[in-house]
Regions:
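Structural recognition of the beta-strand scaffold that forms the well-ordered cores
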Residues: 26, 44-46, 73-76, 97-101, ...
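Divalent metal-coordination and catalytic microenvironments
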Residues: 23, 37, 47, 78, ...
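Short Gly/Pro-enriched turn/cap motifs at secondary-structure boundaries
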Residues: 15-16, 25-27, 113-116, 135-139
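Metallo-beta-lactamase
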Residues: 43, 50-52, 123-125, 130-228, ...
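Active-site HxH/HxHxD metal-binding segment of metal-dependent hydrolases
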Residues: 50-55, 61-123, 224-226, 230-233
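Short, flexible loop segments at the rims of nucleotide/cofactor-binding pockets, characterized by
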Residues: 22-26, 74-77, 175-180
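Conserved beta-strand hairpin/beta-sheet module of binuclear metal-dependent hydrolase folds
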Residues: 10-64, 68, 145-166
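N-terminal pre-domain segments of enzymes
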Residues: 1-14, 237-247
Length: 249
């Protein structure tokens, strides 16, 4: 939806970490987004990314004032290696429990064996954070999306992530499973019913992470706090999925 930068090697896409809002921090790279949530009783990390960029993620965690040992849970939104490639190594480093949607566990096994399998409606509670998961298949069969609340300056914001927005697996030759197109559209429609104040992407081009982060650092203006970003992105995903289906019959 926003500008996508490509690098010959994924580890070249280094980004400076920053606090998005409340307890939510970006510690990822151009290649794949990684977020941490400071729950007060340890960190929840979302999508460690590529194994080749794990050193960037760990460095960013330190820069934000935390340590890998603070991580209690590693949430994986879907099984693809650009999000889960570093899960096994990071879990070994910090001792965290790993989570993934139950329908992605088998394919994720080439990267790691999950400690906790997520079902629709499951809630992960740690400290002041309650993270709710919805099964949103399409990109993969076991994709999960997630929602939680965070506070800043006396205001409460609902944070949301679409766990698998990519349309690349909606092309016939790259289908993750049968009926993925129908599932994807149903997932988008379901997510449109969720109220989200702060949309975090699992890739930086989903929500303009780089540009909004620079604005936040330089001016203090927080463009991440905008409910229209969520609905606009989901509408974009719907149109793109329909277009793929029409051109790839």
């Amino acid at each position: 939806m926003f500008e996508r930068k490509n690098f010959e090697n994924v580890w070249e896409g280094k980004m400076e970490p920053f606090k998005i809002v409340g307890d939510v921090y970006f510690v990822g790279s151009f290649a794949a987004s990684t977020h941490i949530i400071d729950t007060g009783d340890g960190l929840i990390l979302i999508d460690p990314g590529y194994i080749e960029t794990l050193h960037l993620v760990v460095d960013s965690i330190y820069k934000m004032g935390f340590k890998p040992e603070d991580i209690q849970y590693i949430v994986n939104t879907h099984w693809h290696g650009d999000h889960t490639g570093a899960t096994k190594a990071l879990a070994s480093l910090c001792g965290a429990k790993t989570l993934i949607g139950k329908n992605d566990a088998e394919k994720a096994a080439c990267y790691f064996k999950a400690d906790i399998l997520l079902n629709d409606g499951d809630v992960l509670e740690l400290g002041r954070t309650k993270m709710r998961f919805l099964e949103t298949p399409g990109h993969t069969k076991g994709t999960v999306s997630l929602f939680f609340e965070t506070e800043e300056n006396g205001k409460t914001y609902r944070v949301g992530m679409f766990g698998g927005a990519g349309a690349n697996t909606l092309v016939k030759e790259k289908f993750d499973y049968d009926n993925c197109r129908e599932d994807y559209l149903n997932s988008v429609h379901r997510l449109l019913g969720e109220k989200v104040d702060v949309f975090i992407g699992n890739h930086v081009w989903n929500n303009n992470t780089e540009v909004f982060g620079e604005i936040l650092r330089k001016t203090g203006e927080n463009k991440f706090i905008d409910s229209s970003l969520w609905t606009n992105f989901l509408n974009f995903c719907e149109k793109r999925a329909i277009s793929v289906a029409e051109t790839d019959k």
